[in-house]
Amino acid sequence: MPSTARAPRPRLPSAPFPELPAWASGPDWALHAGDCLERLAALPETSVDLVFADPPYFLSNGGFTCHSGRRAPVGKGTWDASRGIEEDHRFTKGWIEACGRVLKPSGSLWISGTQHVIFSAGFALQSLGWRLLNTVTWFKPNASPNLSCRYFTHSSEILIWAAPRRPGRLQHHFDYPRMKAENGGKQMRDVWALPRPGDEELDADGQGRIWTLTSPRLEEKAQGKHPTQKPVALLRRIIEATAPAGGLVLDPFSGSGTTGVAALRLGRRFLGIEQDPTWLALARARLEAESDGAGPAGDSFGPRRSRTRG
């Protein structure tokens, strides 16, 4: 049976954090409490290597969903309530613009979302003059069924990878050699297959078509559960590919701190922004456990071998 012990975390090169008072912090991470637009405005320009954003999907407006096989109201919090399509888009465009200000010339931005918000984000990026680098589909094999039986089950999310458009050749960081090595010596495509350990290949021709990752495992929620928590494995691939070693990763909607957990394990530094005290406390517990090497052994990346073929 393979060992569940986690390999030692990579040592970080010495690099200062932006000089801002943090709600909580460790040697390689900091959490800032408050509105993301206000906190982003306080950060120095060109100080961040990578932004991963999982913004509100604006779904908490009295609707219903399926939770553990039962009908349940969609009520994640006031932060997820829509204020109307125009105001929602104005907010989306505002935080994207704020992220662009703090990105280094080699920096880039990832946005995760469903159809409820991702097209607004894409239009905002285009209207701000960003370069759309890739879109990726994240397939959830354990997605909840739909209740109305009037449309297909929502079993995927879209991720946009983009960078501010700058004069000259592309400058954004991309670890092409590492991604190619992980893909068996072939160029990695913008649609990946990352099956669960033990799964068989998903395609008859061996070509990976989408990122196949389950929702966060129970071990990843050992210290608490966030309603929109992302799996650590998803963030591992993103950060490993697009943030330099020792670089600063920013999450303006940090929630339970998953981005920070993945960043620390990969030898990157992390700065998170969150306005909800409950999720700040959860993120702090996870990051402190990670810094101390006491995080749950199961809250890991899983096997390093990737079944991506395309």
Describe the residue ranges of each PLM region.
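Conserved SAM/SAH-binding loop
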Residues: G34-E38, R304
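A short acidic-Thr-Gly-centered motif at the start of a beta-strand
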Residues: L20-S25, A41
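Well-ordered alpha-helical segments embedded in enzymatic catalytic cores
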Residues: R39, G94-W95, L234-I238
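Class I S-adenosyl-L-methionine
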Residues: P2-F17, P27-A30, E45, F52-A53, ...
